[in-house]
Amino acid sequence: MRKKSSTPNRGFRVADQIQRDLTELIARELKDPRVGMVTIQAVEVTPDYAHAKVFFSVLVGDPKACEEALNQAAGFLRNGLFKRLMTHTVPTLHFHFDRTTERAADMNALIAKAVSSRAKDD
């Protein structure tokens, strides 16, 4: 039987704090040229805080190269989180490129195309 947490939203708060700290660490301390302007979109932490999926988007540059660089720097970033977080364990970081913004732009283009073709028909 699973034990209920004494603080119900702790996982969300930890994920939010990891997101804020990673954003700062990547911007200020990570010197890899493959990592350009990165935005951390979301962080999902497992219930045991052993792993965290970090979803990011890139404004400029190659997403695959950036994902590879971030996954290679995961140990360095995790070490930085150890110094900032006041938790017993800091999760292992797994970076994934978030395609949500690309899909949203594609959907907006399709909607605009449908609206313009409908306006021509009227």
UniProtKB/Swiss-Prot annotation:
Keyword Cytoplasm in the entry? The reply is: yes
Q: Which residues cross the membrane?
A: none
Tell me the leader sequence span. Answer: none
GO molecular function terms listed in the Swiss-Prot or TrEMBL record: ribosomal small subunit binding
| Gene Ontology biological process terms from the UniProt entry | maturation of SSU-rRNA
Q: Where in the cell is it found?
A: Cytoplasm
Cellular compartments per GO CC: cytosol
- A Pfam family it matches: RBFA
Q: Which UniProt keywords apply?
A: Cytoplasm, Ribosome biogenesis
Q: Name the InterPro entries for this protein.
A: KH_dom-like_a/b, RbfA, RbfA_dom_sf
Q: Which PANTHER family does this entry report, sorted A to Z?
A: RIBOSOME-BINDING FACTOR A, CHLOROPLASTIC-RELATED
Per the similarity annotation, which family is this? Belongs to the RbfA family.
What is the protein's quaternary organization?
A: Monomer. Binds 30S ribosomal subunits, but not 50S ribosomal subunits or 70S ribosomes.
Q: Quote the function comment for this protein.
A: One of several proteins that assist in the late maturation steps of the functional core of the 30S ribosomal subunit. Associates with free 30S ribosomal subunits (but not with 30S subunits that are part of 70S ribosomes or polysomes). Required for efficient processing of 16S rRNA. May interact with the 5'-terminal helix region of 16S rRNA.
Give the protein name, as stated in the record. Ribosome-binding factor A
Kindly list the organism's lineage.
Bacteria, Pseudomonadati, Pseudomonadota, Betaproteobacteria, Burkholderiales
This protein's encoding gene: rbfA
